[in-house]
Structure formats: C-alpha cells, structure tokens
From Swiss-Prot:
The keyword Transcription applies. GO terms for biological process: regulation of transcription by RNA polymerase II. Pfam families: Med10. Residues 141-158 have a biased composition (Gly residues). Belongs to the Mediator complex subunit 10 family. This is Mediator of RNA polymerase II transcription subunit 10. Component of the Mediator complex. Keywords: Activator, Nucleus, Transcription, Transcription regulation.
C-alpha cells in the first residue's frame, strides 16, 4: 500500500475532528435549556471549538497538492467532454488507436527480424570468412544461429523459436 502524504493525513484528522465537534454541538443543541446559563456557555464554547477546527482544516487543506498535479487530464479529453461527447467513447477510440499502433510496431519488428535473418544467411553464404562475426551480430540482436553450414544457418531451431524470444 502506498504511503499516505503527511498533509493528507493531517486533513483527514482535521475532518474527523470537525465531525466530532459537530456531534458535540448536536448534543448541546438537543440538551439546550434556554433558561439555564451553563448550557448556553457550553454551546457557545463548542461552536467556537468547531470554528477553530474548521479554520485548521481550511489551512491544512491549502497545503494539499491539486488532484490534477498528480494525474493530468489530457486536453483532447477535456475538449471532447466540453463538446458534449461521451468520455467512454474517447477512451475506446484511444485504446483502438494504441492497439493499431502496437500492431504496426510489432509488424515492423517482425519484418526487421526476418530481414536480419535473411541478410545473415546471405552474408554467411556469400562471405564464409565472416560467418563468426555474422553469428555474433545475430546473437547480440536477439536472433538464434545454428552453427551448421550453408543455407540452414539461421533457420531450423532458430527459425522455429523466433516467436518466443523476439517479441
């Protein structure tokens, strides 16, 4: 559980005190005797205590950060709501946009991964003296290489397992 902000804790305590003082005033009002002097003084004292507690609450509440300081609301969402539209629709459209962008990025990642493997295979077949360097680069970029000769290097086990580690 996240730690509670000390200012927030003070405000919570002040609210509890206000509720307690309101209860005390309620008790004094329900037992009020217009002819009796002690009840009038006690009620006045409880109202003054309530006033001080409310003042303390107001002072401590001024030190709290604004809610938007922690979680800013996107300006397009504010405009969307001000134009009388449903924020749930905005959220759904935003989620769909993010999903499409993620699919596009994933497609690019797969295309580059496949290009890396094809390029490595072609470089190994055309420049066999660079095979160790090519395998080192493919391994460093998340690909799997098979130490075999010719066209099979870069396919086989590595080609089948790409969907697991490269995503």
């Amino acid at each position: 559980m996240a730690p509670i902000n000390p200012d927030l804790q003070n405000v919570q305590d002040d609210i509890k005190n206000v509720i307690q003082d309101l209860f005390q005033v309620l008790v004094q009002v329900s037992n009020y005797d217009a002819a009796g002097r002690p009840t009038r003084d006690v009620l006045a004292q409880d109202i003054q205590t309530l006033d001080k507690t409310l003042h303390t609450l107001h002072t401590n509440a001024q030190h709290l950060p604004t809610p938007t300081a922690d979680k800013p609301i996107p300006e397009p969402l504010i405009q969307y709501v001000e134009n009388g539209r449903n924020p749930d629709i905005y959220t759904r459209e935003f989620a769909e946009l993010v999903r499409r962008m993620n699919q596009l990025a994933r497609g690019k990642m797969h295309a580059f991964r496949d290009f890396r493997d094809v390029l490595a295979r072609e470089m190994e077949s055309a420049l066999p003296e660079l095979r160790a360097d090519v395998q080192m680069v493919v391994g460093a970029t998340g690909g799997r290489t098979v130490g075999g000769e010719g066209e099979g290097a870069g396919q086989g086990e590595g080609g089948e397992g790409r969907g697991e580690g490269g995503n």
